[in-house]
UniProtKB/Swiss-Prot annotation:
Organism: Danio rerio
Encoding gene (name): rpusd1
Active site as annotated: 67
PANTHER family found in the cross-reference section: MITOCHONDRIAL RNA PSEUDOURIDINE SYNTHASE, RNA PSEUDOURIDYLATE SYNTHASE DOMAIN-CONTAINING PROTEIN 1
Signal peptide as annotated in the record: none
Protein name per UniProt: RNA pseudouridylate synthase domain-containing protein 1
InterPro entries documented for this protein: PsdUridine_synth_cat_dom_sf (IPR020103), PsdUridine_synth_RsuA/RluA (IPR006145), RluA_PseudoU_synthase (IPR050188)
Family matches, as Pfam families: PseudoU_synth_2 (PF00849)
Top-rank taxon, per record: Eukaryota
GO biological process entries: enzyme-directed rRNA pseudouridine synthesis
Family designation: Belongs to the pseudouridine synthase RluA family.
GO MF term list: pseudouridine synthase activity; RNA binding
């Protein structure tokens, strides 16, 4: 339960093109604020100064985002070409992610498919939040899908909670937090979506457990060790196991292997869909990652 520091950076995978780190909770990926000394970017610069790219504002290109409060697998590209390849995988929704969470209450159904559309909350005092379609002040809601699988029932600090595996099939901001809150089972320690009431846990209990990026020459799949175990947090007391995490991971990997084999089979050549100017601009902005120019 030690807080983040420059020294405690955990590397899950490293090559000449990518580094995947196990992001600590309560740390920003990057920041332009002078007072934000502890960021993943500063950790990377501290441990790998020779890998920083002087042509970018932060020195490193993050392939995706994790919230300040979320821990787990975070992929970093070490050059522009690698960033471009990763971008295509995310853009085409070919990346597979799975998260672990402790949520409030007892999730009675073992498997759930959530499809609440999510938009930006424009209500005064809540503009930093997202919300489900139909909420007053919900702007530009977009379709979102999350698969929920119950792992264990137990208690956290004496309160009923459920440990779940969350698989986002889309990538909307705060998607998992909003979806869990929408079904009446907010994530333990989610200060924002509990409207500042759930403030006793030392962290928000959301962890990016599994990440698979199907890069052509360097497919990446990593797991970030489960932090929600009694040996690491004595306040978490599992009482009944419903699904074994390792078995669910095997099922995910089996599906991935089948999908990869299907992709490897030759198909009739068809013209590639034309990328719009907006998509091309988004790609260039993402690749530049706040260029110094």
């Amino acid at each position: 339960m030690e807080p983040a520091s420059l020294e405690n950076l955990s590397v899950l995978y490293q090559s000449t093109n990518y580094i995947v780190v196990n992001k600590h909770w309560d740390i920003r990926i990057d920041s332009k604020m002078w007072y934000e000394k502890q960021t993943v970017q500063s950790q990377l610069k501290h441990h790998f100064p020779e890998l920083a790219d002087p042509g970018t504002y932060y020195g490193f290109r993050f392939c995706h985002q994790l919230d300040f409060s979320t821990s787990g697998a975070l992929c970093v590209a070490l050059n522009k070409a690698a960033a471009g390849q990763a971008y295509r995988c995310f853009k085409d929704r070919r990346v597979t992610k799975a998260y672990l969470a402790l949520v409030r209450g007892t999730v009675t159904e073992e498997n759930l498919s959530l499809d609440f559309a999510i938009g930006k909350n424009t209500t005064e005092g809540k503009t930093h939040m997202m919300c489900t379609e139909g909420t007053e002040g919900c702007e530009n809601p977009k379709p979102c899908q999350t698969e929920v699988t119950v792992l264990e029932y137990g208690t956290y600090d004496g309160d009923q909670v459920t440990k779940v595996l969350l698989q986002p099939l889309t990538g909307r901001t705060h998607q998992l937090r909003v979806h869990c809150s929408a079904i009446g089972h907010p994530i333990v320690g989610d200060y924002t979506y509990s409207l500042r009431t759930d403030n006793s846990p030392y962290r928000m209990m959301l962890h990016a457990y599994f990440l698979h990026i199907p890069l052509h020459n360097e497919p990446i799949h990593v797991t970030a060790p489960d932090p929600f175990v009694p040996s690491l947090d004595a306040k978490w007391a599992p009482l009944r196991c419903v699904n074994i995490l390792e078995d669910l991971l095997k099922n995910i990997l089996t599906k991935l292997q089948a999908a990869m084999q299907e992709e490897a089979e030759p198909e009739p050549r068809t013209s590639s869909p034309v990328e719009s100017e907006e998509q091309r601009a988004q790609c260039q902005q993402w690749l530049c990652e706040w260029s110094l120019e």
